[in-house]
């Protein structure tokens, strides 16, 4: 699961426990090692240096507790850390933990709803359900996509009972030109 070279790596936050954050920190090193190996290979082959964009969107669980530690850890590893509910657009992709419906306090719950509301390529988390929608923006003459990704979690909270058994756990990798995305399951890190 660490062999691919994505343009973007995106986590949607919501680290619910200290154990979960410790798991993420442990595996950040694996991401960094993969990137450093590829950069060394590019230098040796005199190719363009691989510099992926790593984005962490802080979630509602992160802001309930002191998230300065989370921010510090990820920033030290070169990640762009996005505050909760604050969208950021990088190379035409908008990232946010979750996005509200226009003029409302309610959040968009499906990828289709994200496209109908925001009319742009957008990646969000918040939910524990995966969803994808694609449409055509007449104004720009281009396809637009919305992806709802579950949160990176390794230790589902106790209150979920067995409800978490249906949750996909992991992270999203995105490649541009052509646009492709891959869901990476967290279990591959534990092998």
Where are these regions (language model features)?
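Conserved beta-sheet core of the metallophosphoesterase superfamily
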Residues: 91-190
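Core catalytic region of metal-dependent phosphoesterases/phosphodiesterases
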Residues: 1-82
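Short, flexible, glycine/charge-rich loop motifs used to bind or transfer phosphoryl groups or to couple energy/partner
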Residues: 44-45, 86, 109-113
């Amino acid at each position: 699961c660490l062999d691919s070279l994505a343009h973007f790596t995106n986590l949607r936050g919501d680290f619910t426990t200290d154990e979960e954050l410790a798991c993420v920190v442990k595996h950040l090193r694996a991401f960094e090692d993969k990137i450093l190996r590829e950069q060394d290979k590019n230098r040796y082959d005199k190719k363009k240096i691989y510099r992926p964009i790593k984005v962490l969107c802080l979630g509602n669980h992160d802001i309930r507790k002191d998230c300065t530690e989370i921010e510090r850890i990820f920033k030290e590893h070169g990640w762009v850390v996005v505050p909760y509910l604050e969208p950021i657009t990088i190379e035409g992709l908008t990232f946010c933990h979750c996005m509200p419906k226009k003029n409302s306090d309610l959040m968009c719950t499906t990828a289709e709803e994200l496209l109908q509301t925001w009319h742009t390529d957008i990646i969000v988390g918040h939910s524990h359900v995966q969803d994808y929608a694609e449409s055509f923006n007449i104004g720009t003459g281009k396809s637009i996509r919305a992806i709802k990704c579950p949160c990176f979690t390794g230790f589902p909270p106790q209150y979920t009972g067995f409800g978490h058994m249906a949750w996909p756990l992991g992270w999203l990798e995105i490649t541009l030109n052509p646009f492709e995305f891959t869901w990476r399951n967290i279990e591959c890190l534990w092998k």
